[in-house]
Swiss-Prot record, chain A:
GO terms for molecular function: ATP binding; lipoate-protein ligase activity; lipoyltransferase activity. Catalyzes both the ATP-dependent activation of exogenously supplied lipoate to lipoyl-AMP and the transfer of the activated lipoyl onto the lipoyl domains of lipoate-dependent enzymes. The gene is AIM22. Residues 146-330 form the BPL/LPL catalytic domain. It comes from the Eukaryota. It catalyses: L-lysyl-[lipoyl-carrier protein] + (R)-lipoate + ATP = N(6)-[(R)-lipoyl]-L-lysyl-[lipoyl-carrier protein] + AMP + diphosphate + H(+). Belongs to the LplA family. Keywords: ATP-binding, Ligase, Nucleotide-binding. (R)-lipoate binds at K249. It comes from Saccharomyces cerevisiae (strain RM11-1a) (Baker's yeast). In the transfer reaction, the free carboxyl group of lipoic acid is attached via an amide linkage to the epsilon-amino group of a specific lysine residue of lipoyl domains of lipoate-dependent enzymes. Gene3D superfamilies: Bira Bifunctional Protein, Domain 2. This is Putative lipoate-protein ligase A.
Swiss-Prot record, chain B:
PROSITE patterns: BIOTINYL_LIPOYL, LIPOYL. The keyword Transport does not apply. This is Glycine cleavage system H protein, mitochondrial. SUPFAM superfamilies: Single hybrid motif. The modification N6-lipoyllysine is found at K102. The gene is GCV3. The keyword Cell membrane does not apply. Binds 1 lipoyl cofactor covalently.
Amino acid sequence: MSMMLSNWALSPRYVGQRNLIHCTTLFHTLTRWAKDADDKYHDINSMYENMFTPSNDNVSILQDEGKSDYDTTKTSSMQEDISAFNKDLYNFYNIGYAKQIMSASQLENIVKAKGRFVIQSLSTSPYYNLALENYVFKNTPRAKRGPDNCRLLFYINDRCAVIGKNQNLWQEVDLAKLKSKNFELLRRFSGGGTVLHDLGNVNYSYLTSREKFETKFFNKMIIKWLNSLNPELRLDLNERGDIIQDGFKISGSAYKIAGGKAYHHATMLLNADLEQFSGLLEPSLPNNMEWESSGVHSVKSKIKNVGIITPNQFIAVVSERFQKTFKVDGEIPIYYCDEFKSINDEIKDAMNTLQSEQWKYFSGPKFSVKIKDKGLTIKVEKGMIYDCDRNDLIGLEFKGFLENIDSYT
Amino acid sequence: MLRTTRLWTTRMPTVSKLFLRNSSGNALNKNKLPFLYSSQGPQAVRYTSQHEWIAVHQDKTAFVGITKYATDALGDATYVELPEVGTEIAQGESLGSIESVKSASEIYQPADGTVEEINTNLEENPGVVNEDPMGDGWLVKMKLGEGVNVEQVEGLMSLEQYEKTLVHDD
C-alpha cells in the first residue's frame, strides 16, 4: 500500500502538484516566519479548510482503490500513510486553491490583459507592496471602449510611516522617534499626507480609468458595504473624503492620476497599536524649529480603530462585495502575491527607488527652517542646504546636519 | 506651526460643461507669455489626450501647460512639481506632476524637447494653474528637439479635435 501511495504520488499527474506543495509550503514557512501571519489568515484558512479538507469519504475511496493489495497486517502503517497523504492533500488544497501565489509570469499576464480582478498581497513589506501597486497601476491597459479595468488591491504593511510624494519629511515626522519604535519611513508615489501603518491596518487600493475616477466614489462604496454588514459600525464620510467613525478618522486616502488611469488608495485602521503611533507625526524639536515650505502639509486628525471587524474580515467582505458589484461578465477572480514569487525587474526597480536615500531624503519640495536657539535660517532644496546665514553650512546634506545639529554650533 | 493644506479659493463657479466647451476655455490666453513670446504669436497650439497643451513659436521655443478642462477636474492645486532646467525629455515621458486637494496627477511631455525654463512663480503660487491654466499657469518653457514638427507628431490634436474627445469622455 505504501508502495502504491508513493507511485500514485509520483505519477505524472501529481508530481507537479507535489512539487508545488513543497514550494508553496516553503514560501509560506518563510513568510510566516517573517510576519507571523498564521493568526492573520486563520479565518480565511479555516473557511477553506471546511470546504476542502478531505472527509472520511476520501479515505474510503483510497481504500477502495487499494483493495487489490490490501493487507490487514499493515493497516496501521497504511492508515499513517493515508493520513500523511491526506495531510498533503489538505495542504495542497488549502494553499493550492485558496492561496495560490502568482508567479512573475502569471502576474504579468493578468495585469497586462484587460479585465477586473482583486489582488491580495501576502507580503508585509511596505516596499514590496507599494512597488506591486505601482506595477499593477502602470501596466493596467487603458480601456478605450467598454468597461474599464477596475482592480482592487489589498496589502498590510509592517510598521511604517508613509509620507506623500510632495511632502517635506522633516516637517512631518521625527526620524529618531520612528527609528526607536522600529517604524520604516517611506515616501510614496501618490500625493496626500502622512499616515502610519502596522499589521492592524489594511490598505486598499482601487484602480480605475482617469475618466471614471472620482475621489469619493470608492469610500462611499466601502461605507455602504460595511454599514450594511453591521450598522453598529456607523461609518461616515467627511468633507475631505476620508472615512470617519463617531467623528474620529479611521481611514486616510491618497490619489494618483497617470497614463489615463487613476487610483485611490487608503488606510483602514482596524486593530492597529495606536499607542505606538503617538508622537511619531511631529517634526523633531518642534519648539525650536519654525518651518516654511511649499508642498503638501498633513492635516492632523484624531484617529481610532474601527474595532468589531478584523483585517481578514474586512478584506473578505470588501472583496466579496467588490466581486458582486463590479462583475461585468464572468466572475472577478482573487489572486495572491508575495515578494518571493510574484516579483519581476520592474517591481524590484520600484522597490529600489522607494528604499533609496535619494528618493526618501533628497526629493520633495523646497523648504526653509528657522532654528530659534541657534539663530539660524536654513534653506533646503532636494535635501541639500543651499542658503544659510552661516556659509560653512551651505552645501551640506540637511539630514546629516540635523542628526549632528549640536556639533555645528 | 503650519498644519493646514493651503487652499486657493479660485475654483470656477459651477458652469455647465457644455458652456465650457463652447466658450473654448481650452484655447490659449492671448494676453500672456505663452502667446506673446513672439510677436507673431505661436505657430501652432496642440493638445494631448492627457490634457496637456503645447504652444510652439517660430524659433522652436514651446510652452507647455495643462488645459482648463484638466484643472477644473483636478481641483485646487496645492503643489506643482516641475523638471530641472536643462533636462531633455522625450515625448510621453513624465514632465512633472500637479498635486491638488484631490490627487497627484502626472504631466506628460507632449513632444521631444529640452527644458529651458520652468515657471517658478508656481512654487509659491500653485493656484495660478487653476486661475489661468492657458496663460500665466504655463508649466515649462522648452526648446523642441531637432526636426520635431508638432503638426506631425502622432497623438497631438487641434483644439477642435481635443474638445471633441471631451464630449466622448462623459
